[in-house]
Amino acid sequence: MAVPKRRTSKRRKRARNTHKVAPAIVIQSCPQCSAAKRPHRVCAECGYYAGEQRVAAQEA
C-alpha cells in the first residue's frame, strides 16, 4: 500500500486547496426598484426581469 514519505506541509496543502473555494455571490441593483438582487433572476421586491413584470409583487 502506498504511504506518503513526508508529511504534507500547511503551505503545500493550502496551495492545493485554493481551487476548492466557493465563488463570491454577485449582487446587482434592480433597475426598476433599486433593490439588491442576483443577476439573471427575477427581483424579489418588484417582480421585474428584463424590463417586464414576470411575477406579481409580494405585499409585505
Swiss-Prot record:
The keyword Secreted does not apply. Transmembrane segments: none annotated. One of its GO terms (biological process) is translation. GO terms for cellular component: large ribosomal subunit. Disulfide bonds: none annotated. Residues 1-19 have a biased composition (Basic residues). Keywords: Ribonucleoprotein, Ribosomal protein. Residues 1-20 are annotated as: Disordered. One of its GO terms (molecular function) is structural constituent of ribosome. InterPro entries: Ribosomal_bL32, Ribosomal_bL32_bact, Ribosomal_zn-bd. Belongs to the bacterial ribosomal protein bL32 family. This is Large ribosomal subunit protein bL32. The lineage of its organism: Bacteria, Pseudomonadati, Gemmatimonadota, Gemmatimonadia, Gemmatimonadales.
